[in-house]
Amino acid sequence: MVTGILGIKKSQSQTFTEDGKRIPVTVVSAGPCWVTNIAHYGNFAGVQLGFGNRKHITKAQEGQMKKAGLDKKPRFLREIRIPTHPQAHTGGESELGTPPVSASPAGCKVGDTITVGDVFAPGDPVRVTGTSKGKGFAGVVKRHHFAGGPRTHGQSDRERAPGSIGQTTTPGRVYRGKKMAGRMGTDTVTVRGLKIVAVDPQNNILTIKGLVPGGRNGLIIIQKEL
């Protein structure tokens, strides 16, 4: 069975439990999604989901949709990996082209429609993957939480400077990955430990306890914690 779905982050709100406790929630417009392809990777099946609509798609995507028997022009295409073996795990190596464990190891077939009611129920633990908000060009204090230099003792413009970037090597060079100023944000972020509060299959709405990465109307991937 498919363990995830694609959605659009809509808004952040709050709700109250039966005992009056306030909890922050995120409202997500999720699905319906269409299964556009299924690939097999050893102990995993990669289920490609299409979501949203657009006016034009590439010729290659048109051929893929025709092969899947779908009269759709999805805006997004993303793959979700599903374990097909009881001892499957997310680490280690996998072999491409390994025969499937069963005729339909992913619990679905190409052309199927997936809705929030098919995947989630209130109380399910989930993880959400999205693209974090872009912050533009940022210095090391904001981007990497550097302490900065001293404000006094003869210093005039060192308060938010990165300091030395040398490594006392011969020949002298800057190591790859050195934390420096640059563009901040727009990173792929996964938040774990979230929980489904409510499912509205009629309106394709998920309410998730906690905050999810990204800005409003950003694409997110919601997956069950297995």
Question: Where is each model-derived feature located?
Answer:
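Extended basic (Lys/Arg/His-rich) segments that typically form rRNA-contacting surfaces
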Residues: M1-L226
